Amino acid sequence: MNTFGTRLKFTSFGESHGVAVGCIIDGMPAGVKFDEEFLQNELDKRKGGSKFATPRKESDKAQVLSGVFEGYTTGHPIAIVVFNENAHSKDYDNLKDLFRPAHADFTYFYKYGIRDHRGGGRSSARESVARVAGGAVAAMLLREFDICVQSGVFGVGTFVSNLKEEEFDFEFAKKSEIFCLDPKLESDFKNEILNARNSKDSVGAAVFTKVSGMLVGLGEVLYDKLDSKLAHALMGVNAVKAVEIGEGINASKMRGSCNNDALKDGKFLSNHSGGILGGISNGENLILKTYFKPTPSIFAKQESIDKFGNNLEFELKGRHDPCVGVRGSVVASAMVRLVLADCLLLNTSANLNNLKNAYGLK
């Protein structure tokens, strides 16, 4: 499916080498101040063009087609489009019938019987432009509640920061070319990425996301738990292979006496849960870690088959990220924002008082 969300519905469209990519956000309340500069800044953060990302240079200028009037949302669908200006489709001519390892080529072809071989079509990281645009719009709603979502890179390849989560430096990450959260490891991260690129290879990365200013009560019970929604959103991002919330995998190694978040004087004394209990936010910071596999597009010689079953050796052309997780940190923030904005809107009907308040009734 290409649509995500319950009350705030986000739909993305477009392919890597098509005319454009974009999104439609339906369900945004009227009267939210629309910050077009912020939208463009978020898209600019996701852009490639540096030696640590894809060399593909796109202006990524957002055009808002609907849903905004005189600087405010109208309550109607918000359509945003970003035109592709720098696709080199000829680089993919030799891949028309070939299945690239670790890509969606094989599965797309056998599911649909047709696939866009130019840059991977819908399975390309280019689709994340739409996610970042949608996440930026969601952030405009979250601002009204002083909810702030921040992400950065805490691991590249075998280099992983040993800083405590509260020590991660988001101010440094804002200035870092690779959104690095640990100033002492930035050079190691960069070297790891460049070494992978220079050896015609790629490398994975780990992204940390913190949400501050959280309210109590976001999320539903059982099948629409906040942690379920967040995992769903993040696992839908290209190249993501794992998501942790709070202690995550660590919790399986702990005892309850250590993992439980005790309360005293109306406050939690720790946050092993990552801000979620019973699928509902408890007001503490949301803590998430997202793990990206190495970019599957590498320039080393590889083996595969074509759609006729022939064995082949090939070398890729084109322009690809040596570490997709770097720009993935921007996408992670976007998806978390979409989830939280959706949950905020769902809460208006969570109980009778909320529903009456929506109509100004007591």
UniProtKB/Swiss-Prot annotation:
Its cofactor is FMNH2. InterPro entries: Chorismate_synth, Chorismate_synth_AroC_sf, Chorismate_synthase_CS. PROSITE patterns: CHORISMATE_SYNTHASE_1 (PS00787), CHORISMATE_SYNTHASE_2 (PS00788). Pfam families: Chorismate_synt. NADP(+) binds at R46. GO terms for cellular component: cytosol. Its EC number is 4.2.3.5. Coiled coil: none annotated. Reduced FMN (FMNH(2)). This reaction introduces a second double bond into the aromatic ring system. Homotetramer. This is Chorismate synthase. It comes from Campylobacter jejuni (strain RM1221). The lineage of its organism: Bacteria, Pseudomonadati, Campylobacterota, Epsilonproteobacteria, Campylobacterales.
